[in-house]
């Protein structure tokens, strides 16, 4: 039902100079860049102040719910265990939350992958993700695509691993490796001008301190095993989670 006029209206409302940031990174002179931007964008007229309501965090379910979508042609079941989270980049436990998610399901070394892929052989990969934004309105997700016949077992194992990181302190070596992964990635990415531009934009969009990325590595390395456990309990739900499964009902239910 979207018409071309709707796109034009959207563009006119949101693509305005009082709703954008221009980030320039490189071997440049500030005065010259400012002059050039004024020359190229000076005729760009301001629009009306945007007063759209900020998104509001939806409450998680009172008790865990299972939502099943029957897809008769499916050869696999897609599983998502999810809950809403209130997490911002400037929250005190943000870096602990990053480490908790990485240890749970950030890659091949995560709890989920080692259990569902390496141990059980249910899937080619099992991962988790933890979102954040300036409004504190995002999601935690853990999931995998598995054979239809092992769907129930896979759900149980995913919940088991979420419970594990909530109840048990993570091994110090696992935390050390998770930190090293983030530190290495940060250093490599910092060599890319586009990444630096993204950092500058993040500081503005997320109301971060100007030295946020200068202390990034220090904040990562200061996370303790106890911090990880606290973050996992805060952001990874068990009793208030939604389990969504899309698969072939005749094989699963």
Model-derived features: positions:
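Non-catalytic beta-strand/loop surface segments
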Residues: 1-18, 43-91, 102-152, 174, ...
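C-terminal regions of mature proteins
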Residues: 21-26, 173-253
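Zinc-dependent metallopeptidase catalytic helix centered on the HExxH motif
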Residues: 93-95
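Short amphipathic alpha-helices in soluble, non-transmembrane regions
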Residues: 34-41, 154-161, 253
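Helix N-cap motif at beta-to-alpha junctions
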Residues: 26-31, 147-151, 248-250
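Short beta-alpha connecting loops at secondary-structure transitions
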Residues: 142-143, 163-167, 213-216
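A common structural junction motif
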Residues: 39-48, 160-169
């Amino acid at each position: 039902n979207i018409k071309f006029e709707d796109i034009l209206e959207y563009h006119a409302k949101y693509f305005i100079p009082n709703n954008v940031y221009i980030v320039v990174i490189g071997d440049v002179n500030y005065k010259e860049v400012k002059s050039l931007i004024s020359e190229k964008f000076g005729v760009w007229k301001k629009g009306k102040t945007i007063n759209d309501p900020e998104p509001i965090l939806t409450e998680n379910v009172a008790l865990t719910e299972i939502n099943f979508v029957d897809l008769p042609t499916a050869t696999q079941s897609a599983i998502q265990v999810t809950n809403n989270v209130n997490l911002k980049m400037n929250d005190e436990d943000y870096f602990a939350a990053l480490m908790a998610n990485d240890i749970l399901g950030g890659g091949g070394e995560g709890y989920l992958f080692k259990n569902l892929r390496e141990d059980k052989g249910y899937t080619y990969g099992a991962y988790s993700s933890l979102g954040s934004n300036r409004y504190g309105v995002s999601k935690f997700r853990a999931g995998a695509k598995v054979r239809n016949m092992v769907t129930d077992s896979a759900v149980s194992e995913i919940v088991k691993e979420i419970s594990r990181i909530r109840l048990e302190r993570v091994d110090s070596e696992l935390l050390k490796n998770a930190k090293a992964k983030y530190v290495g990635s940060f250093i490599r990415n910092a060599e890319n001008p586009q990444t630096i531009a993204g950092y500058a934009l993040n500081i503005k969009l997320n109301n971060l301190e100007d030295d946020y990325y200068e202390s990034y590595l220090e904040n990562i390395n200061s996370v303790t095993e106890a911090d990880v456990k606290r973050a996992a309990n805060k952001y990874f739900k068990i009793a208030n989670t939604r389990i969504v499964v899309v698969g072939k009902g005749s094989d699963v239910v």
